[in-house]
């Protein structure tokens, strides 16, 4: 196994341990035992428990950032509504394809420490700004109802986070496409005019 595969192996097992036990209860000994590597091997790749936890969260942030594509009202192949649904679908899929990391992101990472809280807040603020700008653009095109785009962005993120929290934490059995349809319907009954 090469170094990148070994690193990925440790990350995957650490994610599983964090998802099962929570950050504070997770121990490096359990991570290395689950990964089948020596403790020294862990430290070749990661400084400490926090470093591996932070990398897991950072990778999820990156995947989410790549999942969202700017809506193009001039796209002749995909309607605005289809593009919006595609973005919702991409976000939902990214978070539900890895429920362990989503659990970590929505529950275990919150309140870890002030520096990590700032990192999470920064991610949510950046997501909110991107969504807010998309909503302002949509308002200019008549695709989004007039109103406070900042509030709309917070409400939208809150709805998505709560839906995924319920699915991941409570084990509610909702098909991804049903979640996409319901979220799109919710937005369509509110500010969306697509």
Predicted features and spans:
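Short secondary-structure transition hinges
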Residues: 93-130, 140-143, 169, 173
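Generic hydrophobic, amphipathic alpha-helix propensity
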Residues: 6-14, 31, 52, 56-67, ...
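N-terminal intrinsically disordered/low-complexity leader segments
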Residues: 1-5, 194
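Amphipathic alpha-helical packing segments from all-alpha helical-bundle domains
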Residues: 62-69, 114-140, 150-154, 162, ...
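Hydrophobic alpha-helical connector segments
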Residues: 55, 69-97, 152-156, 177-180
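C-terminal peripheral helix-coil segments that are non-catalytic and often amphipathic
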Residues: 89-97, 129-140, 159, 166, ...
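Helix-turn-helix
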Residues: 9, 17-51, 55
